[in-house]
């Protein structure tokens, strides 16, 4: 088991970033930055360009933007402003290729396809018109496959970038911060594919790496730096603030994915013209806007149809789905069951004691690597419970009810 712990230093995050950027510029031949239009990648872009102009003026970096078609108008305006400002100082790549992007809104569509050439009349917004836009009519990425997954497209871009720059050692800079989520914290601290024992650089392919040089920045650090240096940023965050969203709800992402669906209704208020096009673009958009922010599918208040257990109702719902989607759920559920039967999830002692008190057949299986607090791993012995409504201290335990809600929320 790999032990990880946070080590605090007297160096502030800005100075640490300067040291990391110097290492990157001295260590790697080819550097490009992935710019999403969000606060983190936007800040990293500005800080990196300031550093490059001051210390490495002859080393031009690339800027990669993966465009998902459906977004707020203010986001498009910010991205346009940014590229207009930097296009002569960087190698710009604005990618608008058809790609498979997950949607959490439809029971019958696992993916939707930004910039789908067969749906051009329904596009949410026009294709950007710049010489550096990469689309089906202008696509130098030889390893691109039509409608490939968005993650694969980003990876293939990095592979192509290396090959188009003399096959030299290449790094992609990412605006990822560890305090955004435990998953990101764990990912950044994954040393298995690290670069020379540096936890914030990880390997993609041969001579292609990803670096997260602001991984230890906090949310307040990001906004303080924007204010201190007077950087431009996506004004969507101002609109989110005025709409009453909490900082962890303010995401610049595809409006149809899991992270953004709960705030989908804001499109109707903030950007009604785009909203009208969203409804016609992806099945379930209107439903998601109505129900995504309610408790219509809340865990505690969902009741079973008469004559069903949660297990039988889950299996009934699975039988109504298209084969491809049904198989995807079955695979996901089997993986979850195997995890809880053989590995176990980390739970607080209060939750463990409550499970034992209520007669659940569980046992300990060491310490969890997925929790910072080093909670005990708990395995469920025998059948997965039908529901765990009697357990009040946690919802993060397996049950057929939880799987049922997963289907009802289109969480595939």
Regions inferred by a protein language model and the residue ranges of each:
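Nucleotide-activated chemistry modules centered on ATP-dependent adenylation/adenylyltransferase
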Residues: 1-32, 41-412
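The Walker A (P-loop) glycine that initiates the GxxxxGKT/S ATP-binding motif of P-loop NTPases
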Residues: 35
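Conserved G/P- and acidic residue-centered "switch" motifs that form tight phosphate/ATP-binding loops
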Residues: 38
């Amino acid at each position: 088991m790999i032990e990880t712990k946070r080590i605090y230093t007297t160096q502030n995050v800005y100075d640490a970033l300067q040291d990391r950027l110097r290492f990157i510029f001295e260590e790697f031949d080819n550097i490009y930055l992935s710019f999403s239009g969000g606060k983190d990648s936007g800040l990293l872009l500005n800080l990196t360009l300031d550093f490059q102009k001051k210390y490495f003026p002859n080393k031009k970096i690339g800027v990669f933007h993966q465009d998902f078609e459906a977004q707020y108008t203010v986001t498009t305006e910010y991205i346009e402003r940014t590229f207009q400002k930097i296009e002569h100082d960087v190698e710009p790549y604005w990618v608008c290729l058809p790609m498979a992007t997950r949607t959490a809104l439809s029971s019958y569509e696992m993916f939707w396809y930004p910039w789908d050439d067969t749906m051009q009349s329904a596009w949410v917004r026009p294709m950007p018109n710049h010489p550096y836009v990469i689309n089906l009519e202008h696509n130098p990425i030889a390893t691109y496959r039509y409608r490939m997954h968005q993650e694969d497209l980003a990876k293939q871009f990095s592979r192509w970038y290396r090959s188009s720059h003399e096959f030299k050692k290449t790094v992609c800079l990412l605006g990822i911060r560890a305090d955004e989520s435990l998953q990101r914290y764990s990912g950044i601290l994954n040393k298995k594919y690290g670069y020379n024992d540096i936890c914030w650089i990880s390997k993609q392919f041969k001579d292609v790496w990803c670096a997260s040089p602001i991984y230890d920045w906090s949310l307040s650090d990001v906004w303080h730096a924007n204010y201190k240096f007077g950087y431009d940023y996506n004004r969507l965050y101002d609109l989110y603030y005025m709409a009453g969203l909490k900082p962890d709800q303010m995401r610049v992402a595809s409006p149809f994915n899991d992270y953004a669906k709960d705030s989908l209704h804001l499109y109707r208020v903030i950007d009604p013209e785009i909203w009208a096009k969203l409804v016609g673009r992806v099945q379930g958009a209107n439903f998601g806007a109505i129900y995504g922010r309610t408790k219509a599918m809340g865990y505690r208040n969902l009741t079973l149809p008469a004559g069903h257990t949660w297990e039988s109702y889950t299996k009934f719902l699975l039988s109504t789905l298209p084969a491809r989607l049904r198989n995807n759920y079955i695979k996901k559920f089997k993986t979850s069951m195997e995890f809880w039967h053989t590995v176990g999830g980390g739970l607080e002692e209060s939750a463990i004691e409550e499970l034992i008190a209520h007669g659940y057949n569980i046992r300990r299986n060491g310490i969890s690597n997925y929790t910072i607090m080093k909670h005990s791993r708990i395995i469920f012995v025998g059948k997965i419970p039908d529901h765990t409504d009697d357990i009040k201290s946690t919802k993060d335990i397996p049950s057929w009810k939880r799987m049922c809600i997963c289907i009802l929320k289109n969480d595939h």
